[in-house]
């Protein structure tokens, strides 16, 4: 989604929200949370408050009128009723074949509400220096996580990674094989963005940065001589990230056409650009997700940009056997989250079994 459109949709949602949601928004913007994250949270609050109105928990007629006391007095049974509403809501739609909203979706909704309740009960201060209220009902609401061993998760993810020579083969496929299948009209569109698309995918595969970190890169953040980029990690922390050498020619090729192809001016600081009606804009995360899905599905299997992050992490662990190094590359404070990659790279375990 283009930044201008994203901000427009955020403003539209904010216009309907209660005052305490607007305070929450400003507080998280200062952290800073990304506009994309805040937009997703606002959508979750909109869904929750619409349910509050429909359920009769409040006498308010509009979302903006829902008093803070409604959240303060929300019971565990009320919140469980909301979860059931989410789970059963698709059944009301005659056009759906699903039995209910996925648990992942429900967990995402509850995560947004947990963030709001933590802010209201712990982080915000009134004139007396106290939170607005103390009772956090979200601490009593259980969430169900998908039960899966690390080994099982690793095996599932492994099928969607481009390991070994497949990393370079994927880039070469986009460059030379993919365009052979296109119509003249589609080929024209592909050629316009070919260098940019290859540069984005090469960077994701060569650095393991998150999608949000990649799209928010500015020109000043790129050092091709040292092959290092500066990114803003979760929580607003700045970090220097090394980039594998194989990405350099793709990044250089994109830079060579960036100004002329996308009509970029000195004021256009974004590294990765898109052009809409002759005006350059920072490319948005949604466009990159669609682009990665399109190319990867045609090559082997449809994947997300996050799977490209997993690809880099797995290849790096395979080469170094160092969880500390992988954690540092990914921007994680702990090596616990990198345990997954030790299970993906399990040749030693398989070799041991073969000897039995």
Curated annotation (Swiss-Prot):
One GO biological process this protein is involved in is: DNA recombination
Domain annotation Core-binding (CB): ranges: 16-121
Lineage top rank: taxon: Bacteria
A Gene Ontology term for the protein's cellular component = cytoplasm
Q: Which SUPFAM superfamilies match?
A: DNA breaking-rejoining enzymes
Activity regulation statement: FtsK is required for recombination.
Q: Which GO terms describe its molecular function?
A: DNA binding; tyrosine-based site-specific recombinase activity
UniProtKB keywords:
Cell cycle, Cell division, Chromosome partition, Cytoplasm, DNA integration, DNA recombination, DNA-binding
Any idea where the Tyr recombinase domain is? 169-354
UniProt KW Cytoplasm keyword: yes
Active site per UniProt: 210, 234, 306, 309, 332, 341
Localization, per the record, is: Cytoplasm
* Keyword Lyase appears in the UniProt entry: no
Question: Pfam families from the entry?
Answer: Phage_int_SAM_1 (PF02899), Phage_integrase (PF00589)
Predominant subcellular localization, coarse grouping: cytoplasm
Regarding protein family, the annotation reads: Belongs to the 'phage' integrase family. XerS subfamily.
Described by its record, this protein's role is as follows: Site-specific tyrosine recombinase, which acts by catalyzing the cutting and rejoining of the recombining DNA molecules. Essential to convert dimers of the bacterial chromosome into monomers to permit their segregation at cell division.
HAMAP family under this entry?
Recomb_XerS (MF_01816)
What's the protein here called? Tyrosine recombinase XerS
Its source organism is Streptococcus sanguinis (strain SK36)
| Name of the gene | xerS
